């Protein structure tokens, strides 16, 4: 919570969150999610979900073999992607690059490209070119 000023210009973040506290005073995913929503961020996608066996269950003599208990995850949070009109042209350009190369999120790319078309930053129907060539770009 102490980084609120630094987050004012942040477009996206990747966080490792825990589903339950592993360390003293560690916030859980629910607490992190609630806080980030209050400052304008929404979860976009999970990059990974780590599972753990519930003790004392051990599979194949390997205590690290994943069971079904959710332990922690890597998650991408974005400034509200439904309010792209609030972003500057430069922020849109940065976000579309992140969406494609870092988040592997073509649906977000298309949404941003459409916003960029409406602002005449790129040519009309460029989002269709992206859709047609998505496999070449990936």
Kindly label every feature range from the protein language model.
Residues 113-138:
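Short, charge-rich amphipathic alpha-helical segments embedded
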């Amino acid at each position: 919570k102490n980084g609120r000023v630094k987050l004012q210009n942040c477009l996206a973040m990747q966080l490792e969150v825990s589903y339950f506290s592993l360390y003293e005073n560690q916030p859980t995913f629910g607490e992190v999610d609630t806080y980030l929503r209050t400052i304008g961020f929404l979860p976009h996608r999970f990059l990974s979900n780590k599972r753990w066996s519930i003790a004392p269950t051990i599979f194949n003599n390997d205590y690290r073999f994943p069971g079904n208990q959710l332990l922690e995850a890597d998650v991408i949070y974005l400034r509200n992607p439904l309010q792209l009109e609030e972003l500057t042209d430069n922020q849109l350009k940065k976000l579309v690059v992140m969406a494609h190369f870092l988040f592997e999120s073509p649906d977000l790319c298309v949404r941003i490209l459409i916003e960029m078309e409406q602002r005449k930053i790129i040519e009309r129907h460029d989002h269709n070119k992206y859709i047609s060539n998505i496999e070449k770009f990936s």
